[in-house]
Structures are given as structure tokens and as C-alpha cells.
């Protein structure tokens, strides 16, 4: 188990090296960022989706200054149910080093040109970084390698660099101890019926379901 942990740590530190900052770098005098500050976040959403899926959308990864990292557990759900999360706990010093690396790389910058693929109704990926100073955020439309064709070399390079940053964040999460996350609160999203002439619920127009719905043998 220790060997596996060391391998994961090596992957995370290698990710920091790719970003251009040594693994031992820190971004504050005491070596850590504010505990409850969201220091890095990846959010994927939007596009042509049903309202119920829109209501269920939540960030793919959220990193806090104290070393908590929430990441979505990928499964075969269609998005019509709330996402499941894992909670990782890593060294806050490693988190500060990662955030410092991302900031120094400068890729999370609203002035960066990530291009606009010629495709409609796709989602967008938003990345936020917040170390010392003001937060920075970028939004990238249709952020999939299959849509990079047709973009300029510079735009493709910017997208590739941002993917490296996101991969490094997931590698950092893999280093820590991981456990299923149980939320302590819920949010209610009311789609509303103001724009519709139909009532919120409509009587079933067909025959009684008991007459044609049979349990599987």
C-alpha cells in the first residue's frame, strides 16, 4: 500500500513539474492557503440538455485550501440523478504548490484564446484558480480533443496546456486518502410552470397502468 501511495505522489509531483514549478514551492508565508477557500475548481455544464439534467449539474472537481478535494465518481448515470462524490484529503502544502504552479503558468487567464470549435449545442468547461490575490477563471467551449481540429496551433496548445492542469489536479486528488462523500445539505431547484399553460401535473390519459404493467417474471 505504501508503494502505491508513493507512486501516486510521484505522479502528482511530476504533474507540478510539467506546470513549471518545483513540487516544494508554496504560495503563502505559512505554506498553506485559507482552509475554506476554493482554490481550484473544474465545472462542466451547459449545452443542449433537459431542464432536469441542468438542475442536477455540479462541479466535476473542487479543491480547498486545507487539502480537501471533492471529485465526481464517474458512472453510467445519465445526469438525471445527483452526482456521487469522493472526498480526498491531501497535504495543504501540496495544494498550495499546485495552485502556485497553475498561477505561474498563466493558462487560467480570461485573455487566453482557446478557440471556438464550429459545433453547436455543446457544453463548456470552466476552470477557476484562487491562490493569493484575486481569483481567475476561464471558460472553454466544446473542450474535447475531437473538436480541436480546425483551431489554430496556438489555440490547440492552450487547450492542451489546460488539460495538463486539470489532469494534475486529478492526480493530486489520487494521492490522498479517499472516501465516499456524504453531503450535509441539499438544494432544491424549482423549474416552475409560469411559462406553460399546463398545470404542474397532468392526469394520466391512458388506461389504468395496472391493466398493462406486469412485473418481470
What would you call each of these model-derived segments?
Residues 65-66, 91-95, 129-136:
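A short, structured loop/turn motif at beta-sheet edges
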Residues 61, 98, 102, 127:
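Short, structured motif recognition centered on aromatic/hydrophobic residues
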Residues 2-29:
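Secretory targeting and sorting signals
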Residues 30-74, 78-93, 112-114:
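An N-terminus-focused feature that recognizes amino-terminal "leader" regions
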Residues 83-104, 162-165:
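Long, charged/polar, surface-exposed segments that mediate recognition or autoinhibition
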Residues 24-49, 53, 107-217:
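Short, well-ordered, aromatic-rich surface patches in folded extracellular/luminal domains
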Amino acid at each position: 500500500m505504501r508503494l502505491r501511495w508513493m507512486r501516486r505522489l510521484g505522479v502528482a509531483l511530476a504533474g507540478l513539474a510539467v506546470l513549471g514549478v518545483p513540487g516544494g514551492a508554496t504560495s503563502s508565508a505559512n505554506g498553506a492557503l485559507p482552509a475554506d477557500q476554493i482554490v481550484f475548481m473544474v465545472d462542466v455544464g451547459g449545452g443542449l440538455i433537459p431542464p432536469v439534467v441542468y438542475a442536477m449539474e455540479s462541479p466535476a472537481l473542487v479543491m480547498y485550501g486545507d487539502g480537501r478535494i471533492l471529485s465526481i465518481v464517474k458512472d453510467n448515470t445519465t445526469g438525471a440523478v445527483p452526482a456521487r462524490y469522493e472526498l480526498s484529503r491531501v497535504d495543504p502544502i501540496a495544494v498550495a504548490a499546485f495552485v502556485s504552479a497553475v498561477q505561474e503558468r498563466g493558462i487560467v487567464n480570461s485573455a487566453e484564446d482557446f478557440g471556438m470549435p464550429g459545433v453547436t449545442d455543446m457544453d463548456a468547461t470552466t476552470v477557476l484558480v484562487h491562490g493569493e490575490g484575486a481569483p481567475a477563471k476561464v471558460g472553454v467551449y466544446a473542450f474535447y480533443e475531437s473538436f480541436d481540429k480546425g483551431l489554430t496551433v496556438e489555440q490547440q496548445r492552450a487547450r492542451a496546456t489546460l488539460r495538463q492542469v486539470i489532469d494534475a489536479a486529478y492526480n493530486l486528488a489520487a494521492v490522498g486518502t479517499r472516501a465516499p462523500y456524504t453531503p450535509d445539505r441539499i438544494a432544491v431547484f424549482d423549474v416552475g410552470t409560469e411559462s406553460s399553460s399546463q398545470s404542474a401535473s397532468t392526469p394520466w390519459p391512458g388506461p389504468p397502468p395496472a391493466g398493462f404493467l406486469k412485473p418481470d417474471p
